Curated annotation (Swiss-Prot):
Gene3D superfamilies registered for this protein in UniProt: Nucleic acid-binding proteins, Recombination protein O, C-terminal domain
Superkingdom of the source species: Bacteria
UniProt name for this protein: DNA repair protein RecO
Entry similarity comment: Belongs to the RecO family.
GO cellular component annotations of the record: bacterial nucleoid
Alphabetical list of InterPro entries matching this protein: ARFGAP/RecO (IPR037278), DNA_rep/recomb_RecO_N (IPR022572), NA-bd_OB-fold (IPR012340), RecO (IPR003717), RecO_C (IPR042242)
Organism name: Actinobacillus succinogenes (strain ATCC 55618 / DSM 22257 / CCUG 43843 / 130Z)
Keyword list, A-Z: DNA damage, DNA recombination, DNA repair
Role: Involved in DNA repair and RecF pathway recombination.
Alphabetized Pfam families for the sequence: RecO_C, RecO_N
GO biological process: DNA recombination; double-strand break repair
Protein backbone atom coordinates (compact mmCIF):
# COMPACT_ATOMS: atom_id res chain seq x y z
CA UNK A 1 0.00 0.00 0.00
CA UNK A 2 1.48 3.33 -1.09
CA UNK A 3 0.72 6.61 0.66
CA UNK A 4 -0.80 9.14 -1.72
CA UNK A 5 0.75 12.32 -0.36
CA UNK A 6 4.03 13.36 1.17
CA UNK A 7 4.44 13.22 4.94
CA UNK A 8 6.71 15.44 6.96
CA UNK A 9 9.33 13.51 8.86
CA UNK A 10 12.88 13.01 10.09
CA UNK A 11 15.48 10.25 9.99
CA UNK A 12 16.01 8.84 13.49
CA UNK A 13 18.60 6.21 12.61
CA UNK A 14 20.03 4.47 9.55
CA UNK A 15 22.22 1.47 8.91
CA UNK A 16 23.62 -0.28 5.81
CA UNK A 17 21.55 -2.98 4.14
CA UNK A 18 23.20 -5.05 1.43
CA UNK A 19 25.84 -3.32 -0.68
CA UNK A 20 23.83 -0.34 -1.88
CA UNK A 21 20.79 0.14 0.36
CA UNK A 22 19.87 1.48 3.81
CA UNK A 23 17.45 0.52 6.55
CA UNK A 24 16.08 3.80 7.86
CA UNK A 25 14.05 4.49 11.01
CA UNK A 26 11.76 7.45 10.36
CA UNK A 27 9.58 9.60 12.61
CA UNK A 28 6.72 11.16 10.67
CA UNK A 29 3.95 13.53 11.59
CA UNK A 30 1.02 11.33 10.56
CA UNK A 31 2.29 7.74 10.84
CA UNK A 32 4.71 8.02 13.74
CA UNK A 33 7.79 5.82 13.81
CA UNK A 34 8.40 3.33 11.01
CA UNK A 35 11.24 1.51 9.29
CA UNK A 36 11.75 1.73 5.54
CA UNK A 37 14.12 0.17 3.04
CA UNK A 38 15.86 2.84 0.96
CA UNK A 39 16.90 0.85 -2.09
CA UNK A 40 20.11 2.04 -3.72
CA UNK A 41 20.57 4.89 -1.21
CA UNK A 42 24.26 4.02 -0.78
CA UNK A 43 24.97 3.91 -4.50
CA UNK A 44 27.34 6.58 -5.80
CA UNK A 45 24.73 8.19 -8.03
CA UNK A 46 21.76 7.82 -5.71
CA UNK A 47 19.33 10.74 -5.69
CA UNK A 48 19.13 10.27 -1.92
CA UNK A 49 22.84 10.65 -1.32
CA UNK A 50 23.21 13.19 1.48
CA UNK A 51 19.43 13.49 1.91
CA UNK A 52 18.64 10.74 4.43
CA UNK A 53 20.42 12.36 7.35
CA UNK A 54 19.23 12.97 10.92
CA UNK A 55 17.92 16.45 11.82
CA UNK A 56 16.99 17.35 8.23
CA UNK A 57 13.25 18.09 7.77
CA UNK A 58 12.06 15.80 4.97
CA UNK A 59 9.05 15.16 2.76
CA UNK A 60 8.58 11.40 2.48
CA UNK A 61 6.58 8.75 0.65
CA UNK A 62 6.74 4.96 0.88
CA UNK A 63 4.87 1.80 -0.11
CA UNK A 64 4.31 -1.67 1.33
CA UNK A 65 1.97 -3.53 3.68
CA UNK A 66 4.34 -5.29 6.10
CA UNK A 67 6.43 -3.99 8.97
CA UNK A 68 9.21 -3.01 6.55
CA UNK A 69 8.08 -0.45 3.98
CA UNK A 70 9.93 0.64 0.83
CA UNK A 71 10.88 4.30 0.55
CA UNK A 72 9.77 5.76 -2.78
CA UNK A 73 10.36 9.50 -2.37
CA UNK A 74 12.47 11.64 -0.05
CA UNK A 75 13.36 15.28 -0.45
CA UNK A 76 14.47 18.03 1.94
CA UNK A 77 11.69 20.28 3.21
CA UNK A 78 14.23 22.70 4.71
CA UNK A 79 17.93 22.88 5.49
CA UNK A 80 19.30 20.65 8.25
CA UNK A 81 19.03 21.99 11.79
CA UNK A 82 22.56 23.08 12.80
CA UNK A 83 23.22 20.86 15.83
CA UNK A 84 26.82 21.03 17.00
CA UNK A 85 28.92 19.53 19.77
CA UNK A 86 26.80 18.83 22.88
CA UNK A 87 23.59 19.71 21.04
CA UNK A 88 24.42 17.13 18.37
CA UNK A 89 24.89 14.32 20.89
CA UNK A 90 21.70 15.45 22.62
CA UNK A 91 19.87 15.14 19.31
CA UNK A 92 21.15 11.58 18.92
CA UNK A 93 19.88 10.86 22.44
CA UNK A 94 16.39 12.14 21.61
CA UNK A 95 16.35 10.06 18.42
CA UNK A 96 17.37 6.94 20.32
CA UNK A 97 14.65 7.53 22.91
CA UNK A 98 12.03 7.59 20.16
CA UNK A 99 13.43 4.43 18.56
CA UNK A 100 13.42 2.61 21.89
CA UNK A 101 10.20 3.62 23.61
CA UNK A 102 7.43 4.41 21.10
CA UNK A 103 5.47 1.74 19.25
CA UNK A 104 5.87 1.53 15.49
CA UNK A 105 3.19 3.18 13.33
CA UNK A 106 1.43 4.85 16.24
CA UNK A 107 0.41 8.31 15.00
CA UNK A 108 1.11 11.18 17.38
CA UNK A 109 1.19 14.58 15.72
CA UNK A 110 1.59 16.35 19.07
CA UNK A 111 4.75 14.39 19.92
CA UNK A 112 6.08 15.16 16.43
CA UNK A 113 5.65 18.87 17.16
CA UNK A 114 7.36 18.40 20.55
CA UNK A 115 10.27 16.70 18.76
CA UNK A 116 10.55 19.48 16.19
CA UNK A 117 10.44 22.10 18.96
CA UNK A 118 13.15 20.23 20.88
CA UNK A 119 15.46 20.12 17.85
CA UNK A 120 14.84 23.81 17.19
CA UNK A 121 15.79 24.66 20.78
CA UNK A 122 18.89 22.45 20.60
CA UNK A 123 19.94 24.30 17.44
CA UNK A 124 19.52 27.68 19.15
CA UNK A 125 21.34 29.12 22.14
CA UNK A 126 18.42 28.32 24.42
CA UNK A 127 20.38 25.67 26.32
CA UNK A 128 20.54 21.92 25.92
CA UNK A 129 19.26 20.82 29.34
CA UNK A 130 15.91 22.69 29.33
CA UNK A 131 15.16 21.38 25.82
CA UNK A 132 15.94 17.77 26.78
CA UNK A 133 14.04 17.84 30.05
CA UNK A 134 10.96 19.37 28.43
CA UNK A 135 10.94 16.72 25.71
CA UNK A 136 11.43 13.87 28.19
CA UNK A 137 8.44 15.05 30.23
CA UNK A 138 6.32 15.37 27.07
CA UNK A 139 7.38 11.86 26.03
CA UNK A 140 6.41 10.46 29.44
CA UNK A 141 3.01 12.12 29.09
CA UNK A 142 2.54 10.48 25.68
CA UNK A 143 3.45 7.10 27.19
CA UNK A 144 0.60 7.52 29.65
CA UNK A 145 2.76 8.39 32.62
CA UNK A 146 0.30 10.18 34.89
CA UNK A 147 2.23 11.15 38.02
CA UNK A 148 0.78 13.99 40.08
CA UNK A 149 3.55 16.46 40.93
CA UNK A 150 1.29 18.71 42.99
CA UNK A 151 -0.07 16.32 45.65
CA UNK A 152 1.44 13.74 48.01
CA UNK A 153 0.47 10.25 46.82
CA UNK A 154 0.20 9.06 50.42
CA UNK A 155 -1.87 11.76 52.10
CA UNK A 156 -3.37 13.63 49.16
CA UNK A 157 -2.14 16.89 50.68
CA UNK A 158 -0.73 19.60 48.40
CA UNK A 159 3.03 19.40 47.91
CA UNK A 160 4.98 21.65 50.28
CA UNK A 161 7.91 23.46 48.66
CA UNK A 162 10.20 22.89 51.65
CA UNK A 163 9.46 19.20 52.22
CA UNK A 164 11.12 16.22 50.54
CA UNK A 165 9.24 13.50 48.68
CA UNK A 166 10.24 10.00 47.64
CA UNK A 167 9.47 8.81 44.14
CA UNK A 168 7.69 5.45 44.00
CA UNK A 169 7.30 3.86 40.58
CA UNK A 170 3.70 3.88 39.30
CA UNK A 171 2.51 5.52 42.54
CA UNK A 172 3.98 9.01 42.60
CA UNK A 173 5.64 11.01 45.35
CA UNK A 174 5.19 10.44 49.07
CA UNK A 175 6.55 12.57 51.92
CA UNK A 176 9.90 11.33 53.23
CA UNK A 177 12.33 12.43 55.93
CA UNK A 178 15.18 10.45 54.35
CA UNK A 179 17.09 12.26 51.62
CA UNK A 180 18.72 10.20 48.89
CA UNK A 181 18.81 9.85 45.09
CA UNK A 182 15.10 8.97 44.95
CA UNK A 183 13.87 11.99 46.92
CA UNK A 184 13.02 15.45 45.63
CA UNK A 185 12.17 18.79 47.19
CA UNK A 186 8.59 19.93 46.83
CA UNK A 187 9.75 23.06 45.02
CA UNK A 188 11.34 20.84 42.37
CA UNK A 189 8.10 18.87 41.88
CA UNK A 190 6.13 22.08 41.41
CA UNK A 191 8.69 23.23 38.84
CA UNK A 192 8.30 19.86 37.06
CA UNK A 193 4.55 20.43 36.87
CA UNK A 194 5.11 23.89 35.35
CA UNK A 195 7.85 22.57 33.01
CA UNK A 196 10.05 25.34 34.39
CA UNK A 197 13.67 24.23 34.05
CA UNK A 198 15.44 27.58 34.29
CA UNK A 199 16.99 26.80 37.70
CA UNK A 200 20.09 24.55 37.46
CA UNK A 201 19.04 22.71 40.64
CA UNK A 202 15.65 21.94 39.11
CA UNK A 203 17.29 20.73 35.90
CA UNK A 204 19.52 18.38 37.88
CA UNK A 205 16.55 17.01 39.82
CA UNK A 206 14.53 16.62 36.62
CA UNK A 207 17.35 14.64 35.02
CA UNK A 208 17.37 12.25 37.99
CA UNK A 209 13.61 11.85 37.79
CA UNK A 210 13.39 11.22 34.03
CA UNK A 211 16.13 8.61 34.21
CA UNK A 212 14.14 6.72 36.83
CA UNK A 213 10.80 7.19 35.07
CA UNK A 214 12.10 6.12 31.64
CA UNK A 215 13.98 3.07 32.92
CA UNK A 216 10.97 0.70 32.74
CA UNK A 217 10.56 1.61 29.06
CA UNK A 218 14.27 1.42 28.20
CA UNK A 219 15.14 -1.71 30.19
CA UNK A 220 18.73 -2.51 31.12
CA UNK A 221 20.22 -2.04 27.65
CA UNK A 222 22.49 1.05 27.74
CA UNK A 223 21.74 3.98 25.47
CA UNK A 224 24.34 4.11 22.71
CA UNK A 225 24.03 7.89 22.46
CA UNK A 226 25.15 8.27 26.09
CA UNK A 227 28.16 6.04 25.44
CA UNK A 228 28.98 8.04 22.30
CA UNK A 229 28.82 11.29 24.25
CA UNK A 230 31.01 9.91 27.04
CA UNK A 231 33.65 8.79 24.54
CA UNK A 232 33.74 12.17 22.80
CA UNK A 233 33.25 14.66 25.65
CA UNK A 234 36.99 15.26 26.07
CA UNK A 235 37.23 16.38 22.46
CA UNK A 236 34.44 18.90 22.94
CA UNK A 237 36.17 20.83 25.71
Amino acid sequence: MAIETFQRGFVLHRKPYSETSLLVDLFTEETGRLTVLAKGARAKRSAWKGVLQPFTPLLLRWSGKGALKTLTKAEPAAIALPLQQTALFSGFYVNELLCRVIEAETPNGELFQDYLHCLTRLASEDGVEPALRTFEFQLLTMLGYGVDFTHCAGSGEPVDEAMTYRYREEKGFTASLIKDNATFYGRDLLAFEARDFRDPAVRSAAKRFTRMALKPYLGNKPLKSRELFAHNILFLK
